[in-house]
Curated annotation (Swiss-Prot):
This is Cysteine-rich protamine. Testis. Protamines substitute for histones in the chromatin of sperm during the haploid phase of spermatogenesis. They compact sperm DNA into a highly condensed, stable and inactive complex. This protamine condenses spermiogenic chromatin in a pattern which comprises fibers with a progressively larger diameter and lamellae that finally undergo definitive coalescence. Disulfide bonds join C16-C24, C64-C80. One of its GO terms (molecular function) is DNA binding.
Amino acid sequence: FCGSKPRCRPRCKPRCRSRSKKRCRRCRRRCSRIVKKCCRRRSKCCRRRRRCPCPCPRKKLRCCKRRPKRRCPKRKKKRCRRKC
C-alpha cells in the first residue's frame, strides 16, 4: 500500500519509481507514492496504482474490475469483485 515502498527489480526501477507526482484518480490530489505498473511480466513490483494517503473519503481505487480473478491485496482469502 501507499505507506510501504514498492518492491522493484533492478531493471524496473527507472520506470517504476518516477519522481513526478501522480494524481489520485478519485480526489485528484497529487501523490508521489502512487505507483504505476512498471513491467509486463507478473511479479511483486508489477501492481496497479495504489491508493493515495489523502483524507478524501473516496480515496479507494478500483483494483479488481479489469482482472476479476485476481486476488484482492486486502482480502487475500476471498477474490475481490468489488472496489477494495
